[in-house]
């Protein structure tokens, strides 16, 4: 009998990338899983096809009669009618982070943290372990192309658990990591933390939760006696040197006190080389030989919406990316320039959150100017209300690009079809992802 047999878990915001992975995990453990989300999506349809009941109307009358546990995402508004009805039923109610934390209590856990790069790094660690025959369960904050899922599920009880550790709302402090990775700390979520100093402190708190090694990129300000430092500098425990990078393939070397390993990564960008270095160290620390790790990385296929090359033919190229912070945008556009130095870059960017746009207005303006042509969609509000004076128009006025414009979402497909850009990038963390398949299919007909 499976552990969840006969018990029902109800999930508010079940269609989110993190929530849907949890839903799949609980379903695999025998739980009856049902939930609510605001709108249908390809992911919710997949969950329904896997046997989970989902509805899209905030209606307490359709709640299951028997519920054992409620799990919610912070993205769900507290005044949701269903949420209020569930609280009145005096049920155990857990945040997603707390639920994931309970799972990590019972497994050897590798937790991947960082304001950028954690999804790709988590997928890399999971792929290496899986490829090298290590029993692995992984919760990934995106759809890993090697698994075509955000959940890698081991059928064995004694599996290694790999999880993405989210700093938003200090969620990662609910986890119980044995090995942790911290690969970036840039100012973000200032609505939660106030300033970078408090953000760094939270990452230090996360490091101190770690039982064994803390694998940390150089220069982040993490103070721990269990740290293993990596980066391009000479004084690191693991020093990485890029040999060459062309046509989306990067060759590099990782040197440590006792080994030198050459690696070919089928990805562009210095940031991805550092992600791979962190994954390499984590795999090595649980006993996987360096030659096996290097071999596994050659077959890593990336994550959907992370430098995701959707079309690349003689006439046109289309790349989709989740970047929504200035440093992520810089990394992506730099990698595109390195991979396609002769091409004219048209960027469609959907700013994510009024607060983030306000806090980094000048930084966004600087990095968006790395494109040759800029198309801005309206700000995606997510959980926020508008902020006076903060708009895509205000941002556009600050960007020093000759060809720039605002575009309504309903006009985007026609605009792109008329312009037929040589190299198109769609970018953002909002609902811009709904355009990816239509754009891909259209560009393939040009």
Locate the predicted segments by residue.
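Beta-strand->loop->alpha-helix junctions that form or flank phosphate-binding loops
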Residues: 36-37, 55-58, 94-98, 139-142, ...
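Nucleotide phosphate-binding/pyrophosphate-handling subdomain across enzymes
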Residues: 2-8, 18, 25, 29, ...
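Conserved N-terminal Rossmann-fold NAD(P)-binding element of oxidoreductases
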Residues: 9-14, 427
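Short acidic/histidine-rich motifs immediately flanking catalytic phosphotransfer sites
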Residues: 65-69, 159, 420-422
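A glycine-rich beta-strand to alpha-helix segment
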Residues: 411-442
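C-terminal helical cap/extension that packs against the catalytic core
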Residues: 228, 365-422
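NAD(P)-binding Rossmann-fold cofactor-contacting core
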Residues: 32-46
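Phosphate-binding loop of NTP-binding sites
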Residues: 2-6, 25, 31, 48, ...
